[in-house]
A protein has these predicted regions:
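Single conserved hydrophobic/aromatic residue that forms the stacking wall/gate
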Residues: 153-163
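Beta-propeller folds
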Residues: 1-155
Length: 163
């Protein structure tokens, strides 16, 4: 098993599995109370967690295009930040964010509790330094908060009820 992520209602868990120790992950979803594995299955995720939307309708994840067998071990470029709605097929997932002009950049997202605010962390390759962008309302463009790779910035304090 790779990563896990429990939704806000604590009734569903998204978990990733890998095949043979590969970095490629397949995400699955399980009902915590019943133990039922739902039909949701997300393939070709890599270097990604699952971040639930506040309303538990689904989660965000990073994926790459499916490589052909010859390119399976090559450098992966041009990831997409996707949104998967629970109960739908992966082919219906929505591209939430991408930047084809920066093929080595990768994405992770933090959904701020009880708001529409989303923080996008952008990294390049395996470098831990990142950029932070913010989306204040659904459908709006992301605004750069920190637009250079100089330090590792996190958004942990944004979810702290003490703030």
């Amino acid at each position: 098993m790779g990563s896990t992520s429990i939704n806000n209602s604590a009734d569903l868990i998204a978990y990733s599995v890998s095949d043979g120790g590969s970095d490629w992950r397949t995400w699955k979803v399980m009902n915590i109370d019943s133990g039922e594995i739902l039909s949701d299955e997300i393939s070709w995720a890599k270097f990604s967690g699952a971040t639930w939307e506040n309303d538990d309708s689904g989660f965000f994840y990073q994926k790459y295009d499916e490589p052909n067998e010859e390119l399976l071990k090559d450098i992966n470029e041009s990831p997409k930040l996707m949104f998967h709605k629970i109960g739908t097929d992966q082919s219906e997932d929505i591209v939430f964010y991408e930047n084809s002009e920066k093929p080595r950049w990768g994405w992770s997202i933090n959904v701020i509790k009880d708001t529409d605010i989303k923080l996008l962390s952008i990294s390049e390759g395996t470098d831990e330094r990142n950029r932070l962008y913010i989306q204040l309302n659904k459908g709006e463009k992301f605004i750069p908060l920190i637009d250079e790779f100089c330090l590792l910035y996190t958004s942990d304090a944004a979810d702290d009820d003490a703030c």
